[in-house]
């Protein structure tokens, strides 16, 4: 176990500074289209919404991040395409939109056919799970800028205007259903890599809790695509949705100004316990950085909670309160 108490900022990602940078950029984006295609919401929610008559078009863009460096280390790239799709699709689902089309952006140091085939394998698998088409993309060779590769994409979704879920219906007393993640997903990997680099382990070592797989392979487990949320929306009265990604539970502030009391959270997978132990990472930093076993949240009246839990394989993990974010006795701030 590390004697240090590593943080995300120690690894090079300062969430506070990142938020200030994003805010500065957004302040410059002053032009707004009018009429058909005009934005229905401001910038900052899970997806941007555009006026399209009875419907809203929803747009998201995201990438795999530094998880690709572990793929390079393991020389296995057939899952990062799933991650790329998942990070975008899950953000669409978090505002109630159905994904319909995707375009990818692959920036390369150099071209390798075998590598590209594996990237494509993951992309098509993710698209199949999401029930949408990949309609194009861009491949750029940038040897002076890129070392290795970077993978990102943009996703288009559609939702009836009266079915958009932005969190305005969330009320005190609503129940929170937590839906399990498959592990670390695609956030916090700069800290993950820092922990492994400073530990006694390598990516090719067996997991200490499961000798049947290597640490690197465990960390490459694809991000879960929560497409069953569409079934929840049809069957239940949903008040709010949340995709737990970068900044962990802190991102819940974009859903509602009310509070979240996670009195019975899902148990974090063993990979989180391993990373926390090896990096000496404090509980608060873990929940500020990772999904900690809960990759998606559904907020709804108690009458529909059991139904939502059954559809998603989740469980009731908490309730909406007046203020704050709390996981048992831990205050997230």
Curated annotation (Swiss-Prot):
This protein's UniProt keywords: ATP-binding, Cytoplasm, Ligase, Nucleotide-binding, Purine biosynthesis
Pathway entry: Purine metabolism; IMP biosynthesis via de novo pathway; 5-amino-1-(5-phospho-D-ribosyl)imidazole from N(2)-formyl-N(1)-(5-phospho-D-ribosyl)glycinamide: step 2/2
Chief location: cytoplasm
CDD domains the record matches: PurM
GO molecular function: ATP binding; phosphoribosylamine-glycine ligase activity; phosphoribosylformylglycinamidine cyclo-ligase activity
Single biological process term from Gene Ontology: 'de novo' IMP biosynthetic process
Presence of the UniProt keyword Zinc in the record: no
GO CC annotation: cytosol
Entry annotated with the keyword ATP-binding: yes
Group of enzyme by EC: ligase
Database matches in InterPro entries: PurM-like_C_dom (IPR010918), PurM-like_C_sf (IPR036676), PurM-like_N (IPR016188), PurM-like_N_sf (IPR036921), PurM_cligase (IPR004733)
Known EC number: 6.3.3.1
Localization: Cytoplasm
Catalytic activity: 2-formamido-N(1)-(5-O-phospho-beta-D-ribosyl)acetamidine + ATP = 5-amino-1-(5-phospho-beta-D-ribosyl)imidazole + ADP + phosphate + H(+)
PANTHER family: TRIFUNCTIONAL PURINE BIOSYNTHETIC PROTEIN ADENOSINE-3, TRIFUNCTIONAL PURINE BIOSYNTHETIC PROTEIN ADENOSINE-3-RELATED
Family: Belongs to the AIR synthase family.
Name of the protein in question: Phosphoribosylformylglycinamidine cyclo-ligase
The species this protein was found in: Methanosarcina barkeri (strain Fusaro / DSM 804)
Gene: purM
